[in-house]
């Protein structure tokens, strides 16, 4: 049985409803977010999970400050030092404003940090864990310009561009699914919206409309688990395959008030039988 800790949407750097500490110049909210992140790391280490899966949006800003980067890196280092594989998926807030610039999590790949895998583009991976290999098909957040040239999108409306992008991603995903080894656990990790999701506070942080994948296209029986990020409401979808948004780790704005925040611990049997335990912070 492989035990996977799934969390997303950390958004370090969110300062709403906090106050500035005059001694450090940092928002008091930073302590809240780091405390939540520490609980994730402590749980993973104390319970010796086999894989930590982060599904995007490490920071609030696409150009995070050095302090936020340091604090994020310190906690990823603890997991790495504990010999726990960490899979970091790029979200929309992890992408730079200009094409060609590095993502905010790319430094872990550049430095070849042990036990850390960074997924910046759609790709299939095989991650070695204590219990054996896990297959992950990664669908990080993608700019429209990354898949569609100006010529491709010429004279198309915004909705038509989104539809074309959705069709391309679905076609790619179906192709990758055909290459999965049915004898190994398989996970879809995505930072995206799907047609059955209930939006949350992420809507206040977006410009324009998300591209949306059909729920039926990601609820493929070839997967043991569909791990998602981007939607801040904690939610699971009733389907043959568990489709899970763990939600943001901390309250982002008043739209999150009264809602449970946390992460998921998922157990995947080699036979494909699944069971999950939600650990709410």
Briefly describe each language-model feature range.
Residues 71-83, 215-222:
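Catalytic-core regions built around general acid/base machinery
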Residues 194-272:
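Conserved beta-sheet core of the metallophosphoesterase superfamily
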Residues 56-75, 90-113, 128, 200, ...:
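Metal-dependent catalytic neighborhoods of phosphoester/phosphodiester hydrolases
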Residues 10-11, 49-67, 84-99, 192-211:
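Active-site neighborhood of divalent metal-dependent phosphoester/pyrophosphate hydrolases
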Residues 179, 268-281:
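A short C-terminal boundary segment appended to hydrolase-like catalytic domains
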Residues 7-8, 51-57, 85-92, 117-120, ...:
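Active-site neighborhood of phospho(di)ester-bond hydrolases with catalytic His/Asp-centered motifs
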Residues 1-75:
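N-terminal active-site segment of His-dependent metallophosphoesterases
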Residues 106-211, 249, 269:
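Conserved catalytic scaffold of divalent metal-dependent phosphoesterases
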């Amino acid at each position: 049985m492989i035990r996977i800790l799934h969390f997303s949407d950390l958004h370090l750097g969110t300062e709403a409803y906090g106050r500035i500490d005059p001694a450090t110049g940092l928002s008091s909210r930073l302590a809240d977010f780091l405390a939540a992140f520490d609980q994730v790391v402590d749980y993973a280490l104390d319970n010796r999970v086999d894989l930590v899966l982060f599904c995007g949006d490490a920071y609030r800003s696409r150009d995070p400050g050095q302090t936020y980067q340091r604090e994020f890196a310190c906690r990823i280092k603890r997991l790495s030092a504990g010999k726990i594989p960490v899979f970091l998926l790029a979200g929309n807030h992890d992408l730079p404003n200009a094409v060609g610039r590095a993502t905010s999590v790319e430094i872990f790949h550049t430095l070849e940090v042990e036990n850390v895998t960074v997924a910046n583009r759609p790709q299939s991976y095989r991650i070695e864990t204590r219990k054996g290999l896990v297959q992950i098909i990664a669908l990080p957040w993608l700019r429209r310009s990354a898949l569609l040239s100006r010529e491709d999108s010429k004279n198309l409306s915004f909705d038509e561009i989104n539809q074309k992008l959705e069709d391309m991603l679905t076609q790619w995903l179906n192709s990758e699914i055909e290459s999965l080894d049915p004898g190994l656990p398989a996970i879809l990790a995505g930072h995206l919206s799907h047609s059955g999701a209930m939006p949350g506070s992420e809507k206040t942080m977006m410009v324009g409309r998300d591209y949306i994948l059909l729920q039926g296209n990601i609820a493929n029986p070839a997967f043991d688990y569909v791990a998602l990020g981007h939607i801040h409401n904690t939610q699971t979808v009733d389907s043959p395959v568990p489709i899970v948004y763990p939600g943001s780790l901390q309250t982002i704005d008043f739209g999150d008030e009264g809602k449970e925040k946390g992460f998921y611990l998922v157990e995947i049997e080699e036979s494909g039988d699944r069971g999950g335990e939600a650990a709410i912070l």
